[in-house]
């Protein structure tokens, strides 16, 4: 098995840093699932905890070369400590390139090379050898995208910066936030304690076409669907977002799950936050 990749775009390097940092906050162990056309981030969190599923298409990388377990099963699953990955790329924001390679340093390693400009015409390389476990095929089933049945409502999110500021303020008041949305493009956030209730209203957000189809099935578009989630877990989803997504979607499974989808060009992030 072989894997080599290189990112030279500053914005994609920043997003790689951001995803790695978020994964480290959600799970101690992460699996990088390497496929011929994309790279997946698969945090191995506990059942019932918030989860993230990240996906980077091959076009994100200036160079991408891999050979999987076999021609039939052309994938590689690398298990590593999430914190190790986050630390290795933490200071790569000003790097001219970020290289990833599966190597053998007495044991399998994911070698990260951060190339930094030291003076005009010269670069210096910071190398990190992260121990990894190459998962056998019988474990690949644990690295698949989380399955979510059809949501009860889908609505486009407001500007993430606005939403993050609102969630931060609410986190200082209460530990949980009630998220509501309907098929008329409305979304509400509510935090409530014995002494105070704070509620934010968003309207005219719009709904994706498949959600609007529910209206033709006799469903009242004004009916609000809700889920109550941990404020800190919701805030983690917006932490560090430096690149605005081209599409941001909120899916709610009534009183069960908050599912957020952020898409930016060839990168997509999904957050799964269970009700609490």
UniProtKB/Swiss-Prot annotation:
One of its GO terms (cellular component) is nucleolus. One of its GO terms (biological process) is DNA damage checkpoint signaling. InterPro entries: Cell_cycle_HUS1, Hus1/Mec3. Belongs to the HUS1 family. Interacts with RAD1 and RAD9B. This is Checkpoint protein HUS1B. It comes from Mus musculus. The lineage of its organism: Eukaryota, Metazoa, Chordata, Craniata, Vertebrata.
């Amino acid at each position: 098995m072989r894997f080599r990749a290189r990112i030279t775009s500053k914005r994609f390097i920043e997003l790689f840093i951001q995803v790695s940092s978020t994964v480290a906050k959600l799970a101690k162990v992460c699996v990088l699932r390497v496929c011929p056309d994309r790279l997946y981030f698969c945090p191995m969190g506990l059942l019932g905890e918030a989860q993230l599923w990240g996906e980077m298409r091959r076009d994100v990388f200036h160079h991408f070369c891999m050979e999987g377990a076999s021609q039939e099963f052309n994938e590689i699953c690398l298990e590593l400590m999430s914190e190790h990955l986050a630390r290795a790329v933490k200071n790569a924001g000003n790097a001219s390139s970020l290289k990833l390679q599966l190597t053998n340093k007495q044991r399998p390693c994911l070698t990260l090379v951060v190339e930094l400009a030291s003076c005009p015409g010269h670069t210096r390389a910071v190398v990190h050898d992260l121990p990894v476990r190459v998962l056998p095929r019988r474990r690949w089933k644990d690295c698949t995208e989380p399955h979510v049945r059809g949501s009860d409502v889908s609505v486009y999110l407001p500007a993430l910066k606005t939403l993050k500021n609102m969630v931060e303020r609410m986190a200082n008041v209460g530990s949980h936030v009630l998220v509501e949305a309907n098929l008329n493009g409305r979304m509400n956030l509510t935090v409530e304690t014995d002494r105070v209730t704070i509620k934010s209203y968003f309207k005219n957000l719009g709904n994706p076409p498949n959600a609007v189809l529910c209206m033709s099935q006799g469903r009242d578009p004004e009916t609000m669907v809700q889920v109550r989630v941990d404020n800190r877990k919701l805030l983690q989803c917006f932490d560090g977002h430096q690149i605005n997504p081209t599409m941001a979607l909120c899916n709610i499974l009534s009183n069960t799950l908050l599912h957020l989808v952020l898409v930016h060009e060839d990168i997509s992030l999904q957050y799964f936050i269970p009700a609490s």
